[in-house]
Amino acid sequence: MKEALSSLPLTDAELVSQVKARLYPLTPFTQFLEWLIERLPRKRVAVRLTPQANVAEIDEMAGEYKAISEEPSFQVEIDPLFAKGGWFYLEAALVRHTGDREARFFGKGGRDRRSAFEIPIPSNLRGTVREVFYLPGPVSSLSWAPMHAPGFFSQSCLLVHRISAAESFLRRAHRVVLTLISMRGSRGEARHGLTWQGAAVKLQAAYLQTAQLQIQRYRGHDYAEFIARHDAIKPSELEAMTASIQAAEAQPLISLIMQVRDPQPTFFSEMLGSIRSQSYRHWELVLSMDESVSADCRQVLKAAQREDSRIVVVETHDLTCKAAGLNALLRQIRGDFFAVVSQHDLLPKHALLCIASAVQSQPNAVVVYGDHDCMDANGLRYAPHFKPDWNPDFFTAFDYMANLRLWHTAAVRRLGGFRLGFDEAECYDLTLRCMASCGQEQILHVPRVLYHQRDLKGANAGSPVSMHEPQGGDAGLLALSDHFRESGATVVAGAMPGLYRVRHPVPSPVPLVSIIIPTRDKVDILKACVESIQHGTDYAAWEMLIVDNGSVEPQTLAWLEQIQKDVRIRVISYPGPFNYSAINNFAVQQANGEVVVLLNNDIEVISRDWLTEMVGHALRPEIGAVGAKLLYPNDMVQHAGVALGIGGVAGHVHRYLGGTEPGYYFRAIATQNYSVVTAACLAVRKAVYEEVGELDAVNLKVAFNDVDFCLKLLKAGYRNVFTPHALLYHHESLSRGHDDTPEKKAIFEQEFGYMKTFWGQISDPAYNPNLSLEFEDFSLRRF
């Protein structure tokens, strides 16, 4: 019988150490509690797994597999301790690359030995499993299902102990209490029936409910639940915002302009009602309409005008030129700021109050925008677009602002208003011109849903990507080309309609680039990396510094000697313990290039223009680090930007997404600014690298050094950028945990703690606060 990794002959101590090293670290206090609880009587259970026909082995020693069907499973050999049934505690590292995280045990047992049972096993974002479960003895069969979908996954040995009733009670009670505390103020439905009273009476039922709550997060977050818990502004907050605005010397007048053409009476009336019910009272609505407007709609509008003098109607006979019509309205308004709204869309009651509050905090604002969602004909809200704070590189790849978007009226009039010739891209063109004439701090983002985009066709219900159907692609391309006319950048259509690719110029002759590759033995991996650069890169002026950190294998040493026949390649020695930061700093000091590229030795080139693309960005004066799009060998995303806060410090967004999939509102296929990009493939000007103090070789020898470096670049005033157009493979093991030995785990915990202490809680301008810090897929914040 061929057995999985868990059957390898390890001692108890070795197995425990191996598994625990891969688990997400506990807090010091929880670690102390864990030490106390483990003093209670317990016995380790030998877990031997045999993969079934629906599981294909990739690397058995590393615990890597591929699920061929939606029901991948392993048969569990029935150890005598399992056969008895009772309470057990499972610890394991389980990484699934499909987004599905629904693991479970299932089998048969009980008095008749034939009663089927199924036990859900949740995990956290990092794939750490720490779960108490009960087996109804005697157990006659048992299987382990790591997920409920086809795709790649990896797992450690399953570390299982048969535990006492006391340990079971303490562990279950601890999680139930923590969950209840975290859910204070949540609706009853959001709790899945979990209450303090219920937990006191039926602890096991409450514990299973906490497992279901965790699994529910994996299945996708319910936007209706999110709305109920996070959408409304508390009365006290509303009162404070209102009082603050009223205390100011002047309250900004907000003008809403609208071109009305053949509206549906019901939705048109709802739109008017949503504006008239605004908590903020200093607004005006200026509309233009033509003969297509029905008598019913005219009656609705007249009634609204009689009741509200803030509504102004301008009759027109031609709405065929949108820009001309908008300019006619622009001449009529009195507001300090204005927005273009559509005839069927809605504004939540707090929308203009939030805008006024934002403007009060930054009186010099030129552009202000909020988040938005979609609404069907029945008023159902879905497909929220939670946007980043001002993200100039993303905006020049995609008009992500959409609605609600406001401009400073005087600034727009100085620019000449809306330009003709940019049909369906009038707002994009206007914002690009504002962007060119104002400072970064003058473009504000309010991270709340302030606009409901009506979707009467139901076209957007299936996918968040389709929620914003890009329009005016050619006009947008024209506007963007005009924006970059003086810089010399060229603009071409992007991967999907409405997306754009900006190619920033590289001077001639091209500057020298120094590619730095730390390595130790593993010559096959290094050779593939180097040869892919030699033969798969169209950028001519590069040198390579291979930094040998103590290779001893004869074949590696021979290859390192031979590869230097290529005059572009040097091998330099850095002996001593592994210190990623020190190794790279040492190499940068010896680099001759204007631009340096930090590169892992397990990278392989996909796109020939990867280096040209990265250098074009790196040479921009305002840019610090440039990150590439990295794929696993199975073409799933390994790196497409890093968001702060995910998993405690930072996490790779869109990890395990299909390599060509657009991601959350195109963010996996569009150039954009991220606070952090990975140093597995990172380009930066050498002078900038040295300016911010290099990588931290004292506090961050192994992990988080790229996060720290990128944050130092931000602090120095640079922007970091991710480009999907520099595409490479990263042959990082799919099963790679943070650390796989006690020594590495200790280093990780020290460096994790340093980042938390030194940088603290940093909000990420590239990642909306309404999005999850548990998951990397842009799912919604839950608690």
Where are these regions (language model features)?
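C-terminal, non-catalytic tails of nucleotide-sugar-dependent glycosyltransferases
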Residues: 2, 184, 188-249, 468-510, ...
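Cell-envelope/extracellular polymer assembly enzymes that use nucleotide-activated donors
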Residues: 252-257, 284, 429, 511-516, ...
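Short, acidic, metal-binding catalytic loop of nucleotide-sugar glycosyltransferases
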Residues: 272-282, 361, 531-541
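Glycine-rich, basic loop-to-helix element that forms the pyrophosphate-binding segment
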Residues: 316-333, 574-591
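A recurrent flexible, glycine/aromatic-enriched loop bordering the glycosyltransferase active site
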Residues: 323, 381-410, 581-583, 589, ...
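Short aromatic/hydrophobic "clamp" motif used to bind/position activated sugar donors
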Residues: 338, 596
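Conserved donor NDP-sugar-binding/catalytic core segment of glycosyltransferases
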Residues: 346, 350-382, 440, 456, ...
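A short, conserved alpha-helix in the catalytic core of glycosyltransferases
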Residues: 411, 421-449, 480, 610-614, ...
